[in-house]
Amino acid sequence: MGKDLFRYKGMKRILTLITCLTLIQTAAIIMQAEWLSEAVTGLFNGKGITSLLPVIGFFLIAFIARHGMTVARQKIVYQYAARTGADLRKSFLDQLFRLGPRFAKKEGTGQMVTLAMEGISQFRRYLELFLPKMVSMAIVPAAVVIYVFFQDRTSAIILVAAMPILIIFMILLGLVAQRKADRQWKSYQRLSNHFVDSLRGLETLRFLGLSKSHSKNIFYVSERYRKATMSTLRVAFLSSFALDFFTMLSVATVAVFLGLRLIDGDILLGPALTALILAPEYFLPVREVGNDYHATLNGQEAGKTIQEILSQPGFKEETPLQLEAWSDQDELKLSGVSVGRSVSDIHLSFKGKKKIGIIGASGAGKSTLIDILGGFLEPDGGMIEVNGTSRSHLQDGSWQKNLLYIPQHPYIFDDTLGNNIRFYHPSASAEDTTRAAASAGLTELVNNLPDGLEGRIGEGGRALSGGQAQRVALARAFLGNRPILLLDEPTAHLDIETEYEIKETMLDLFEDKLVFLATHRLHWMLDMDEIIVLDGGRVAEIGTHNELLEKNGVYTKLVKAQLGERA
C-alpha cells in the first residue's frame, strides 16, 4: 500500500474501520464454509433435513453477515472517497491559484483541467477499489490458510506453495501494465492539451486556411491515445486470464489430492469439504486485486501527479502589506528584479496614478514583467518595495485586491451577460451593471439579446466576437473600478478596426488609475504617460513617446519596423 495515502485526512481511521469489518467478514467466510460442509456431510450420511435446520440457519446467518460486511465496507469507502476527492479538488485548485497562471500555462491548461475533473474522479475510483481489497488481501488468505491447516495440512501446504507463484506472476504483469499505463496517461495528457490548444487556435487556423490540414494532427494524437489504451487493455485481459488460470489450477490440485485421500480413507468428508470450499476463498482477494489493478492505474497516476503539484513550493512567506486603495501618494519600486532568462536586473519606480506602456519585441519580457506586477510570478532575485516595505514578490491579498487583470483572451462563462460582467463584483446592482455595460460599449449587444443583461452568452448561449468578449472584460473593469490595471496584449487578437473602436472606451477606463499596458501595437504609446522599452529581458529605455524618439534608440527601431510593415 502506498505510504502517500496516509497523508490524506482520516486515512488511518478508515483503514482501522475497514480492518474490523474485514475481520468479521473473514470469520463469516470460515463459518459459512464450516456449516455448509457440516450440512452437506449430514445429508450425505443420511440425516433428515429437519435435524440439519439449525446448521442451515447458521449458514444463512454467516452468508448474510459476509455480504452485509461487504456492503458496509463499500458504503464507508465510497463516502470517504467522495469526501477525500472533494477536499483534494479544493486543495488542488487552491494550489493552482497560489502558483498562478504562469504555472498552469507551463504545465498545460488541458492537463490541469483534466486533473481537476477526470483525474480526481479516477483517484476516487482508485480509493474505492484499492482500500477494501488490499485490506482483504492482507487478512483473508492468512486467516483461511491457518484454518485449513487445522483441517488438512496437505491442502494448506498446497495453498501456501501456490500463493507466491501467483503473486510473482501478478507482479511481473503489473510492472508491464504500469509501463503501459504510464504511456497511456502521458498520451491522454497530450491529447487533452492538444484538444484545448486546437480549440483556442481554431479561429486562427480557419483564417490561415489550415483547419483541414490540422485535422490530420488531431487524428494522429487521437490514434496514439487509442493504441496506448488498447495496448493497456491487452495486458489487462492477459493478466486476468493468467490469474484465473493459476487459481483454478491450484484449486484443482487441492481437489485432486483431497479426492485421492478420501478414496484411501486418509481424511474424512467433513474436513475435506471444508478445505475445498475455502480454497477459492483463499485466492479470491488476490484475484480481485489483480483484476481491479488495471482499473486503478490511471487513478494512481492522477493521484501521484496531483501530489507532485501540491508539493510544489509556493511563494515565500512575507509579512502582509497593509495597503488600502492605491492613491497618488503610494509608490512601487523594483530593484534588480530578475526571473531566469526572461528578465534581468530590472530597476523601475512608479508613484501615484499614471498610464505606463510596456513594449518590446517578442520574447523581450513584457508578459513576465506583467506577471511579476500581478503577483503571479516570484522573481529569482532582486527586491520589491511597496511604500517602503521590502518584499521578494507581490502575491499579497491587499495588493491584488487593488488589481484588475485584463488578459489577451478574457474568459466568457456559460452564464448571463450580467453575471459575466459582475465577475469581480457579484453583489453589484442592476443599475451599476447596466452603466458598466454602456461604458464598455455593450449597449447594442444588450439590446440584441432577448433578455437583455439576463440573456445567456458563452458556450450555452450566444457566441461573442473577439471585440465583444473584450468589451465584456472592459465592463468588468468599469464595474470593479479597481485603481490598478494590468493589461497583457489585450487587443493582439483583434483586427485594427475593432481595436480602434474600443480604444476610446479603454482610454476612459484608464483615467485616474495606475495602468500597465503590455502591447506590440505602438499607437497606444501616444496616450501613455511613460513608456518602458524592454530589450533582451532588460530595461533599454524609459520616457515619453517624443523623448524616446529623440534618443533614436530601441524604441525608434521598433517604430520604424512597425511603420515598415504597414507600408
Swiss-Prot record:
Q: Where in the cell is the protein located?
A: Cell membrane
Q: Does the keyword Signal apply?
A: no
User: Tell me, which GO biological process terms does this entry list?
Assistant: cysteine transport; transmembrane transport
Binding of ATP occurs at G360, A361, S362, G363, A364, G365, K366, S367
Q: Which InterPro entries match?
A: AAA+_ATPase, ABC1_TM_dom, ABC1_TM_sf, ABC_transporter-like_ATP-bd, ABC_transporter-like_CS, ABC_transptr_CydD, P-loop_NTPase, Type_1_exporter
Membrane topology category: Multi-pass membrane protein
Q: Which SMART domains match?
A: AAA
**Alphabetical keyword list:** Amino-acid transport, ATP-binding, Cell membrane, Membrane, Nucleotide-binding, Translocase, Transmembrane, Transmembrane helix, Transport
Tell me the superkingdom of the source.
Bacteria
Q: Where are the transmembrane segments?
A: 14-34, 44-64, 130-150, 156-176, 240-260, 266-286
**ABC transporter domain: from which residue to which, for each copy?**
321-561
GO cellular component terms, alphabetically, are: plasma membrane
Q: Please verify whether the record's keywords include DNA damage.
A: no
Q: What is its main location?
A: membrane
Domain ABC transmembrane type-1 as annotated: residue spans: 17-298
The reaction(s) catalysed by this protein are:
L-cysteine(in) + ATP + H2O = L-cysteine(out) + ADP + phosphate + H(+); glutathione(in) + ATP + H2O = glutathione(out) + ADP + phosphate + H(+)
Domain comment from the record reads as follows: In CydC the ATP-binding domain (NBD) and the transmembrane domain (TMD) are fused.
Q: Which family does it belong to?
A: Belongs to the ABC transporter superfamily. Cysteine exporter (TC 3.A.1.129.1) family.
Q: What does this protein do?
A: Part of the ABC transporter complex CydDC that exports the reduced low-molecular-weight thiols cysteine and glutathione from the cell. Export of these thiol-containing redox-active molecules may be crucial for redox homeostasis, permitting correct assembly of various respiratory complexes and formation of correct disulfide bonds in secreted proteins. CydC contains transmembrane domains (TMD), which form a pore in the membrane, and an ATP-binding domain (NBD), which is responsible for energy generation.
Binding partners and assembly: Forms a heterodimer with CydD.
Protein name (record): Glutathione/L-cysteine transport system ATP-binding/permease protein CydC
Q: What organism is recorded for this protein?
A: Bacillus subtilis (strain 168)
Gene encoding the protein: cydC
